Amino acid sequence: MGKTAIDVWEQIKLLESRGMVIKDKEKAQEVLLDAGYYRLGFYWFPFETTYPNKINRTHQFREGTNFDYIVKLYYFDFNLRSILMKYLNRIEIHFRTFLIYKVSNYYRTSPTWFADSTVVTAAYVRKFDQEVYTNRFKSISIIQQHHKTHINDKYAPAWKTLEYMTLGGIIHLFKALKDKMICRAISEHFKVRQLPVFESYLKTILTIRNYCAHGNVLYDIALPTSIRRGPAGQMESANYHLSLIHISEPTRLR
């Protein structure tokens, strides 16, 4: 398209001039205005003659490339994100809940253990105080109400504060825990014996979750790090993992 904006009908003509078959131009207009020419470009790229070369692209399409193929791939990606997001949210909530439960019960006399340098690294405490709690969490109404009620508390307890932490923040906190026995206990709760493997899973889950949340193209995602295939400790079957986080679909009544 170059650096000059063109309207949707010009976009359709441009695609046709490059060899794309567009049978229903009204529908193509609707899709282009809904998803956008640039975004759809990620989905028609595999149909270009120079694919997968991103340098010196000709933008010409392979013979027989139909706009309908691109639309189907786009909606496949859309639906894939929706499905993954549903289950990734459940994983995120369960991981956060169990971490708060496990560590809070281990350090019962320290309800704000996330800011205790005997529990987590000093570097984490400094960053949390400056960048997280003061700048973001104190604007949350429930946290504000806690400080109005408990005026001498520097922080709200973990079960309040950490509920508002992102998955990335929770993973960062998990890795900052000094007692790796607690980390291993959490890892084994998810039936993964090896802590490094569990952390690699968390990193992958975070990457995919962020892709889904931000509407990024998912069908050809290239993960920055690989994850181990096969047993990761395999203390139970795959069905156990589903039942553990309660994400299996409810059984239909017969």
Region spans (language model):
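Short, contiguous, well-structured surface segments enriched in hydrophobic/aromatic residues
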Residues: 2-197, 219-220
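Extended, compositionally biased non-globular segments
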Residues: 199, 237-243
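Histidine-centered, metal-coordinating catalytic motifs and their short helical/loop contexts
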Residues: 200-224
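Short, charged amphipathic alpha-helical segments flanked by flexible coils
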Residues: 224-238
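Single conserved hydrophobic/aromatic residue that forms the stacking wall/gate
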Residues: 245-254
